[in-house]
Amino acid sequence: MSKDTLFDKVWDLHKVSSLPGGSDQIFIGLHLIHEVTSPQAFGALKDKNLRVKFPSRTVATVDHIVPTDNQSRPFKDNLAEQMIETLEKNCIEHKIRFFNIGSGNQGIVHVVAPELGLTQPGMTIACGDSHTSTHGAFGSIAFGIGTSQVRDVLATQTIAMNKLKVRQIWCENKLSNGVYAKDLVLHIINKLGVKAGVGFAYEFAGPAINSLSMEERMTICNMSIEGGARCGYINPDEKTFSYIKNKLCAPRNENWDEALLWWKSLKSDANSIYDDVTKIDASKVEPTVTWGITPGQSVGINQKIPLLEELSPDDQFVAKEAYEYMGFKPGQSIKDTPIDVCFIGSCTNGRISDLRVAAKVVKDKKVSQNIKAFVVPGSEKVAKEAKIEGLDKIFLDAGFQWREPGCSMCLAMNSDKLIGNQLSASSSNRNFKGRQGSPNGRTLLMSPAMVAAAAISGKVTDIRNFM
């Protein structure tokens, strides 16, 4: 087993007890909730006449089902309105901080918590959402949980978990111009596989990771789950501390000094023992695009969709399904594939830096004819900053739709959906069958810059041609 890694240290600090059967009871420092996975958990508490154990350690917002075209209340979608009302009532009853629409701080939970300074090094963080691993970018141990575990955390502030193994993914060198964090993480998942991380925490490290901004690091950790890992994390450094400083919920004055001293001690030791170490040469990563029905089915922009015989027996089975569903042929080039819809947003790539990069690509250009393109800021704070910088106008002038914050077409639990077998270029995190709202809808995952380039050209295009 691993030893003296950041994961081991944070786990041991939060371990309450060892349980029969080999699992541990782990204290959760921060519990994030939203409108979709919390109602049943609150209902279970009510049935047992229980209260939330530590309301101050729970924070709520709305993101999954909220409309992004019109957020006037009541919503047109009765279910969405009902779910928001339920969360509002539960937060009032249990005295939980709630960042609702119009508060200035509402948005996708994994965008909101970091930008408010709620996410901090050394924490254990849980949320009823798969992409909670995002917060590991700050040196926290963060993982998604199911509704029954949401109930457990609300009631006890703890959950039962088996300790994970730790795989270090050492990323050598640096990314080339026009290659982004999204490309790197898609490349990693392709090389290791979508099941390689099962039972593991991923520690992302090395010169390529160190060179990334905090928002780029969040993109990397966000998609850990797509590689099978329960969580992913990065050792905190000066970039981490600078990002958190002066945020709304960050420590202040002498509390800051005390927190900073502790945070600086939180890192894997130089002689840490890992269960596995994998090396990736970041300088060889190209702009990367998925072609199939899992995030692991991707190719560089100048590569071709793999032939069946080039794949392992296990991968061949899924590849056959992907060829048929996506309408691609083995050996086909992904470049120049015509696109129907372009979506920039999500907890993976809906932050201000993502919008800046995409706006730079589309400035003074026009969206290709017959392309539906839209931008969904990850939070109200992101939307406000984008408007101050004039990014919304750049997108609107180019022919994009500018929406209100929410998860939007990432999971299409709202009104943003593909139609028929439309093909989308998406900056989100999952390309599963039907993920974006239509049973036959198809998704190509890529960086926001690549989505922007696809919107302008009407097809999958090498972003480096726009530079």
Curated annotation (Swiss-Prot):
Pathway: Amino-acid biosynthesis; L-leucine biosynthesis; L-leucine from 3-methyl-2-oxobutanoate: step 2/4. Its EC number is 4.2.1.33. GO terms for biological process: L-leucine biosynthetic process. Its cofactor is [4Fe-4S] cluster. Binds 1 [4Fe-4S] cluster per subunit. The keyword Lyase applies. SUPFAM superfamilies: Aconitase iron-sulfur domain. It is an enzyme of class 4 (lyase). Keywords: 4Fe-4S, Amino-acid biosynthesis, Branched-chain amino acid biosynthesis, Iron, Iron-sulfur, Leucine biosynthesis, Lyase, Metal-binding. Gene3D superfamilies: Aconitase, domain 3. Heterodimer of LeuC and LeuD. Belongs to the aconitase/IPM isomerase family. LeuC type 1 subfamily. This is 3-isopropylmalate dehydratase large subunit. It comes from Prochlorococcus marinus (strain MIT 9301). The lineage of its organism: Bacteria, Bacillati, Cyanobacteriota, Cyanophyceae, Synechococcales.
